Amino acid sequence: MELVKVVNSRQMYEVDQRTICEFGTAGRELMERAGRAVVEAIAARWDGLAGLRVVVVCGKGNNGGDGYVVARLLHQNAAQVDLFLATERAAVGGDAADHLFDTEQAGVPVSELSDCSFEALDRSVVECDLVVDALLGIGLRGAPRDIAALIIDRINDSGRPVMAVDIPSGVEADTGVTPGKSVRAMVTVTFGLPKVGHLFFPGKACCGALHLVDIGFAEPALEDVQPVARLLDRDAMNSLLPRRSGDVHKGSCGTVAVVAGSVGMTGAAALTAE
């Protein structure tokens, strides 16, 4: 029985880099696959994309790059998309910059957020069917600050359904701690392996339903990871439990030893035995 590995952000980064550098999958392609997986999750939950009103909020890093792909693919599938950047275009680099360019070329309206431009975001969020959170990602350390914190407030206050890309913004992937403001998602789509922050509170509560997808990370890179934990899910638990016939009783399936209580504190032991 192979239990699902649970990793931290550094380990996931190493898997990503080995997939790119050793096994020849371009980072741009991984980003495309990640964005496509999110769009497929949206289509499955909303029974199609045409006419769906979606706000996509992106940061400057790779998490934002996934978000640019989401926005472009939604637009190409007849959704109504508003894309908001929590940074200046010039601050976006690498593969993310390439995808931002492609998204703008495809005709997606893109707005840079500043302290004086939140009115457009507020209006779009209130009117949309879904918000896609691609703001901070798994590299977050510490509390979201400045414009990111303001955006998170707007997302949460809107009351609209949220789908988080990889992890809700504000949740630390290595611990599940939320040191400041954090997005409260209905669904989180994550890639390759679950992270610690998906499974430990309060981060777990921010994730909503966790949707794990394979975007083609190299198998040797995944296999070589020494996880910080393994996930014992329902299927794994069921495989560990012996099959019992319908007429079993306490005398036919072994005995239970109770180790509990102390002198003068036997109440819990008595209740357990009963």
Across the structure, where does each feature detected by a protein language model lie?
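Short gly/ser/thr-rich secondary-structure transition/capping motifs
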Residues: 110-117, 145, 169-173, 236-242
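Nucleotide and nucleotide-moiety/phosphate-recognizing core
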Residues: 40-135, 143-165
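Internal gly/pro-rich beta-alpha loop/helix module
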Residues: 122, 129-130, 135-227
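Small-residue (G/A/S/T)-rich helix-start motifs and N-terminal tracts that mark the onset
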Residues: 1-86, 93, 198-274
